[in-house]
């Protein structure tokens, strides 16, 4: 037989946090994926179709938006968690940390993306803009962090 990796499904909201920096880290405003139509909870995960198939996204009312404001303690916990993950994985320059926010307000780490999509209209760039970093400056900053 073949070995398989089986993981527990974590129910909750899909949250994406961009992190920039090498020594001094900055968390960008968080984004989340929301579903406009009722879908079984177990089917709510970011598959290829969910992320990239525009017809599928329209059919199910899937969109990404900024995470509504959290309580200050939860926001602080989110940022500390993302920075700890970034450092633990020895990431540098920029990355995106994907988590689930459970009904108990716990953040569960799903994965780190060390090379997230940087298109102007994608989550990372939109979060940078909300943080006051316009697209040309974002690209300049990423290049300077790589130097």
What are these regions (language model features)?
Residues 1-73, 77-80, 108:
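Phosphate-binding site of ATP-dependent enzymes
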Residues 69-147:
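ATP-dependent carboxylate activation and anion-phosphoryl transfer catalytic cores
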